């Protein structure tokens, strides 16, 4: 299996104007790069504080550190949010969203979405459509799956400036600031699959064979045939066509699978 890693400096949504604070963050970055710079899976460094307002000189010094600690050809690139100070003008890769590559003031660098499929995470956003507990049943799980499918599809409808993204988060988990768990995973906290898992599995080629991965031809019927189920039957598959039958084959439907945008 292929694996790439974005190594991020510790810190989130907090800045202190005391110069010592910035110095300690930069020291964290140096130690982080020294720890991981010989790992071939490292694709990017994220040397700034996540979702934090920081001054321009801090951002430029952080970028300089990534070059000082790995001053060789083919070094991992430095990435940060496109709207943060100094990033759009100086960094190697910027964090953005599908559509940023088509704006008049688009960045010159490649764009990567590091948390796709997620809406703004405030107190009310816990109710958004990409979050569903397995205990809620068929309809909420289908809404979540289709929401993530839409986010995934949007990344394919971009220019070559946009290079991909990573989903947040694979697993349901507890959080410190909300009484309810985060329900946005494609697995629950016990690693049980949701419908959304099948969405992403259906994006792998049917011809793929790998000893460590669930692969090959697949089909998943996202329908429980209960009294609460929708009239439409949603199927996730990587095959060319699907044949559904009910009542011992007395009714059968065969439908082609249309793969838009190559996925």
For each of these PLM feature ranges, what is it?
Residues 166-263:
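Catalytic cores of secreted or luminal carbohydrate-active enzymes
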Residues 1-196, 216-219, 257:
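Substrate-binding/catalytic cleft of secreted carbohydrate-active enzymes
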